[in-house]
């Protein structure tokens, strides 16, 4: 079989991925929806209705929308497409050409800027790798189309102060987009017990949020999500396809044909897990993360963000040579790891397929490499 030599989440060796083994219910629903094209809603009205319900659930349960029935959005190919759509809509609504992004932004914003002929204006970071909000305020210009904040940066899992960013954005009349591709399914629950900021539509300046079901939503890829506060921004990028079944339909996603399988998988998970199920998963992963962080400290390893904001631990590495040596030793022992560049470190993403006991064995390898 062609996949025999590919990675398998179930053996606990995949340490750097933000995807994980799908929930069995989601996998079953995904297969059942293989034939569904959401780009043709007349042919698949119930799948389209399921997508509407998923967007409403995300808006209400995760994103604190005061009127979730007004939310618009789509399940798209991933966080990259979602972020591009957010930038595209902001450009069309505001007429601006600049996007203020943290230095920790996802590479999808580079793609968005190139595709949309926009300019990224980079804001510096604080010591915990969150964006410097005062610096963001100083960077706002008449050409600012969008400010971006992140809930769960790719390299350190840091959570920007979205509440403070919203205040700045509101004061200057600039839209705020939140990239919660990683943290969107966990931060709303962890905030109940840990000091994390609000980041949803209860903040006035937030106009759009990226949240990825194929990460902590336990849905098979491709399943990103873009949720807009209302229809103002998506209507600015809407296109009508007149030749579709039933007399045509409007859409604002980049792709015309869209797989329905990820939507049905998310819908199934919402029914199976619901708010309480996702809450349990979030806390279990974060509690395992804290155990890993404690083990790292015991071994004398330095965490880039301590304590971790979300279920991601980044262990600092002293130089590129050490990083390359760790990559070689990890591969030799069967670990699949990811090295970050800002800061230089090894990322351990505590997804549901991992536990602290397994990861502790890898930490001992890190300690040996750094000590040798």
From Swiss-Prot:
Gene3D superfamilies in alphabetical order: Aspartate Aminotransferase, domain 1 (3.90.1150.10), Type I PLP-dependent aspartate aminotransferase-like (Major domain) (3.40.640.10)
A GO biological-process term: methanofuran biosynthetic process
Keyword Ribosomal protein on entry: no
Uppermost EC category: lyase
Cofactor: pyridoxal 5'-phosphate
Family matches, as SUPFAM superfamilies: PLP-dependent transferases
GO molecular function: aspartate 1-decarboxylase activity; pyridoxal phosphate binding; tyrosine decarboxylase activity
E.C. number(s) listed in UniProt: 4.1.1.11, 4.1.1.25
Keyword terms, alphabetized: Decarboxylase, Lyase, Pyridoxal phosphate
Pathway: Cofactor biosynthesis; methanofuran biosynthesis; Cofactor biosynthesis; coenzyme A biosynthesis
Positions bearing N6-(pyridoxal phosphate)lysine: 215
Catalytic activity from the UniProt record: L-tyrosine + H(+) = tyramine + CO2; L-aspartate + H(+) = beta-alanine + CO2
InterPro entries, sorted: GrpII_AminoAcid_Decarb, MfnA, PyrdxlP-dep_de-COase, PyrdxlP-dep_Trfase, PyrdxlP-dep_Trfase_major, PyrdxlP-dep_Trfase_small
HAMAP family noted in UniProt: MfnA_decarbox
Family: Belongs to the group II decarboxylase family. MfnA subfamily.
Function noted in UniProt: Catalyzes the decarboxylation of L-tyrosine to produce tyramine for methanofuran biosynthesis. Can also catalyze the decarboxylation of L-aspartate to produce beta-alanine for coenzyme A (CoA) biosynthesis.
Protein name from the UniProt record: Probable L-tyrosine/L-aspartate decarboxylase
Organism: Methanopyrus kandleri (strain AV19 / DSM 6324 / JCM 9639 / NBRC 100938)
